[in-house]
Design a protein with these regions (language model features):
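Cytosolic juxtamembrane amphipathic/interface segments immediately preceding
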Residues: 2-15, 65, 76, 152
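Terminal transmembrane helical module of multi-pass membrane proteins
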Residues: 139-185
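Membrane-interface interhelical connector segments
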Residues: 40-63, 104-118
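Interfacial helix-start motif at the membrane-water boundary
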Residues: 56-85
Length: 185
């Protein structure tokens, strides 16, 4: 009887921290892979134009509006990553697409894409965003586990806490990213 009760309450096989670190490593690897995808001239031209339109749009905003624009974009992506299991696939797609956009932007400016990717490691907002995304994808996995174990209340409480944390982190990252954008644009 006691053994069955312990089995029902068994925790997820690894700690939350380890799961976040695994998701963080996977996101970095997938983003890096995106910087090596083949790019044809038409795609490069179209994506490069879109990136420049976004930069131009942000350039015409004041600092707070630019921060809110960046924040809302990143938060929407991050919230989708909380969806059990689907969120991990979506998050990896976002990371692959980000790597691809980095590659196209780098090639447009005649800079080696891996160098641009690695240089992002110096940007604090890069790490804050990545940790937020890894936390959301991890929580999506833990939501699935909680639903499987029928621990709805605990899972909901944990999820709301993580949503609050990543929201604060992404707002901070957006302020830093906007500051970098205006300082070096």
């Amino acid at each position: 009887m006691k053994g069955e009760n312990l089995e029902e309450k068994k925790e997820f096989p690894i700690t939350r921290l380890h799961l976040v670190l695994i998701m963080l490593a996977a996101a970095l690897i997938v983003c890096a892979i995106g910087t090596f995808l083949p790019v044809d001239q038409e795609t490069m031209s179209n994506v490069s134009r879109e990136l420049e339109e976004i930069r131009s749009f942000i350039r015409n905003l004041d600092f707070l509006s630019a921060s809110l624009y960046i924040f809302s974009h990143n938060l929407i992506l991050c919230l989708v990553m909380f969806i059990p299991l689907f969120g991990v696939g979506f998050g990896m797609y976002v990371m692959l697409s980000s790597g691809y956009a980095i590659e196209i932007d780098a090639l447009t400016h005649q800079v080696p894409p891996p160098l641009v990717f690695v240089s992002l490691f110096l940007m604090p907002y890069f790490w804050i965003e990545l940790i937020s995304y890894a936390s959301a994808m991890s929580q999506g996995i833990l939501i699935a586990w909680g639903l499987y174990k029928k621990e709805f209340k605990r899972t909901l409480t944990e999820t709301l806490k993580i949503i609050g944390i990543v929201t604060a982190l992404l707002f901070t990252a957006a302020l830093i990213e906007a500051a970098f954008f205006f300082a070096f644009a």
